[in-house]
């Protein structure tokens, strides 16, 4: 199979889940010509089937809810649930510092808005730095009517995920 490629892109994003599409949005907004490729005939990756939830300490929605959290608590929690010597402290630091900025960017530059989950605890809320809620978020529902023809491109959601049509 010999197919010719006669396209020019600055960034090629592989996949169409939360992380991939956020990367594509940021690259596009930064002036790059972006191509998103997806092996499936449907969009959304595992983010679609899992409900699109994210775990970001100190996010804007938790701050707005006056949640008790801190960067140090997030560090302590991640350390408490990670095998000793098996994590890269620089990557963890980047995650907890930049995660809230990512949520801010999406909130300010896209239609993606999240709902704070004040009663959705960390997996181990009693561990050092653990919290009883406000770190996990899920996307606000999007009307299927707004998606029009693009609705049929979305990966099937988990059976327990709510989808509103109007």
Regions found by a protein language model. Name each.
Residues 11-36:
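N-terminal Rossmann-like FAD-binding beta1-loop-alpha1 element of flavoenzymes
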């Amino acid at each position: 199979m010999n197919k010719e490629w006669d396209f020019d892109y600055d960034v090629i994003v592989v996949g169409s889940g939360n992380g991939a599409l956020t990367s594509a949005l940021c690259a596009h907004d930064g002036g790059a010509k972006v191509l998103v490729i997806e092996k499936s005939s449907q969009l959304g990756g595992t983010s679609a089937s899992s409900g699109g939830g994210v775990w970001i300490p100190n996010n804007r929605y938790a701050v707005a809810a006056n949640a008790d959290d801190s960067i140090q608590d997030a560090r302590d929690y991640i350390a408490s649930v990670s095998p000793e010597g098996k994590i890269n402290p620089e990557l963890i630091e980047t995650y907890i510092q930049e995660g809230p900025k990512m949520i801010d960017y999406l909130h300010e530059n896209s239609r993606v808005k999240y709902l704070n989950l004040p009663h959705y605890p960390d997996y181990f809320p009693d561990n050092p730095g653990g919290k009883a809620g406000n770190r996990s978020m899920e996307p606000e529902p999007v009307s299927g009517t707004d998606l029009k023809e693009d609705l049929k491109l979305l990966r099937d959601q988990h059976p327990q995920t709510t989808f509103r049509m109007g």
